[in-house]
UniProtKB/Swiss-Prot annotation:
Its EC number is 7.-.-.-. The keyword Glycoprotein does not apply. This is Energy-coupling factor transporter ATP-binding protein EcfA2. Residues 3-246 form the ABC transporter domain. Gene3D superfamilies: P-loop containing nucleotide triphosphate hydrolases (3.40.50.300). ATP-binding (A) component of a common energy-coupling factor (ECF) ABC-transporter complex. Unlike classic ABC transporters this ECF transporter provides the energy necessary to transport a number of different substrates. Keywords: ATP-binding, Cell membrane, Membrane, Nucleotide-binding, Translocase, Transport.
Amino acid sequence: MEIKLEQLGYCYQKNSPFEKRALLDVNVSFDSGSYSAIIGHTGSGKSTLLQHLNALLMPTEGKITVGDREIVAGVKQKKLRDLRKKVGIVFQFPEAQLFEETVEKDICFGPMNFGVSEEDAKLRAKKVIYEVGLTEEILSRSPFELSGGQMRRVAIAGVLAMDPEVLVLDEPTAGLDPHGREEIMEMFYNLHKEKGLTTVLVTHSMEDAARYAEKIVLMKAGTVLQIGTPREIFAKPDELVDLGLSVPDVVRFQGLFERKFDVKLTKTCLTIDELTTEMAPYLAKGGA
């Protein structure tokens, strides 16, 4: 499912003394089946933009098109349930939203709230629990007996049970250890490929943006500063650092190598294998 934002703007408490501009003239599209990342310093508007993708927030200017549904600023919207069923959002620390007596009931809550029968919701719960790397026996347990990592997966299963066509991820690995972060990100990527999802990742991890995204949207102060492939975005690491962002370790090491040997490699490398291949001729000559 394609998403398109055109001249999108948003103000909190518009036309009041407390009006605050959060988004201004945002123009970006996310192709159906694509994997995109949104990056930017804290306060750049990433999470505000994210909440427009399933109409949790309504634009105060411009419009957003999600599939065949168009949301225009100032136009009253009806039947938003259909849109929200198609666009699933995994927020930071989603396990904080768990509340039911059992894992099964928690996973079933979303689908049943959107009109799915209890029987079908239970079938979905059995399916998605495996998709998030857990087993069926966990369905009868209280979510509050589980480890933090398991609770995170159960909360994600609740989003997947609604069978969304778009998956929006807002810092989905926040608070996890490195191993847990990698497992969760690989899980999302596999789901993205297997289900043909349109995936939008909001992240502070430049490693994840470089590794998974086909396109990166760079934001600053509520506006889109640049849109490009990971290679294009990370080709100017100094500009990202000036914005208060980090760069992938491979990109940082490439910069150190180029300065040390006073050379310019033929491309911005995003993996160790790419960097090794690019450096090999210079290392063979002893840095000539």
